[in-house]
A protein has these predicted regions:
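Conserved AdoMet/S-adenosylmethionine-binding subsite of the radical SAM
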Residues: 1-120, 124
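Short proline/glycine- and acidic-rich turn/helix-capping motifs at secondary-structure junctions
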Residues: 99-104, 133-140
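Radical SAM enzyme core and accessory elements
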Residues: 123, 135-149
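Residues at the C-termini of beta-strands that transition into short coil/loop
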Residues: 23-24, 132-134
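Structured C-terminal cores of nucleic-acid metabolism proteins
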Residues: 112, 128-131
Length: 149
């Protein structure tokens, strides 16, 4: 989910039997809004409150999906904000390698940035995985829909 707070709370109240994964991509409000304009309607503070409620009711760890882009969310301040955002409840972060497309607005972050994220998150006690892409050499990776001529 991208995180509609009232629906996260409703799912917690309904005692749903699945795990929650949130597409976060930034724990800095202005950056997240640039990536996901949806954030203007449902700011991070409201999302965090709903996630705290989710954890309080379900005791289930929260998973965050987090694509790291070059020049957008690949700096030290970004990982520090993510650590702070995650600390209120047990969580897992899936760092996702971006699959570039021709003429795309986003660029894949350097592997060094992904490894820094992973190290810093793990040092903070947050379970972290890096999801590396396969198939991007033939435009068949997740998120790629390309038509090369």
């Amino acid at each position: 989910t991208s995180g509609i707070p009232k629906l996260i709370k409703k799912m917690a109240d309904d005692e749903v039997k699945f795990k929650l994964a949130v597409s976060l991509h930034s724990a800095i409000g202005s950056v997240r809004t640039g990536i996901m304009p949806f954030n203007e309607q449902f700011p991070l503070e409201e999302l965090r409150e709903a996630l705290a409620y989710w954890y309080q009711k379900t005791k289930n760890r929260i998973t965050y999906e987090y694509v790291v882009w070059k020049g957008i969310n690949d700096q030290k301040k970004d990982v520090e904000a993510l650590i702070k955002f995650c600390k209120f409840a047990p969580s897992k972060v899936n760092l996702i390698e971006y699959n570039p497309i021709d003429d795309g607005l986003f660029e894949q972050a350097d592997e060094k940035a992904l490894l820094l994220y992973k190290r810093k998150l793990e040092e903070a006690g947050i379970t972290t995985t890096i999801r590396y892409s396969r198939g991007k050499d033939i435009d068949a990776a997740c998120g790629q829909l390309a038509n090369k001529q």
